[in-house]
């Protein structure tokens, strides 16, 4: 992948990706089996030793938001939505998880969502389901 090639070109010793504790059952590329297979493929792909790490694998998304807020992460410049477009849709699974994480972390979500996206109050009332 392009990320891997870039890591090799700058002689980085690690590649990190942001799988978190809530991802395992939902996304195949966040499961332990995938991470182990990718780590093996990376080791076989080049003479350089590059380690695949998942620093947030035991963190909830709310934990990540809390820590990001402490570090001053510009959340308005981050992207979660799977639908694409100019704004987050506010309705897809990742948008709902994002909104729930900010709510649980008690951090203001600076994300502009598309018109018609459900409110956090309505999502909370429906146990974070549409």
Sequence positions of predicted segments:
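Iron-sulfur (Fe-S) cluster-binding segments and ferredoxin-like electron-carrier domains
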Residues: 26, 87, 93-116, 120
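Conserved catalytic region of serine esterases and O-acyltransferases that act on ester linkages
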Residues: 116-130
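Catalytic subdomain that performs nucleotidyl-dependent activation
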Residues: 15, 19-87
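Amphipathic, soluble alpha/beta structural segments
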Residues: 92-94, 129-130
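Short, small-residue-biased leader/transition segments that mark boundaries at the very start
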Residues: 2-4
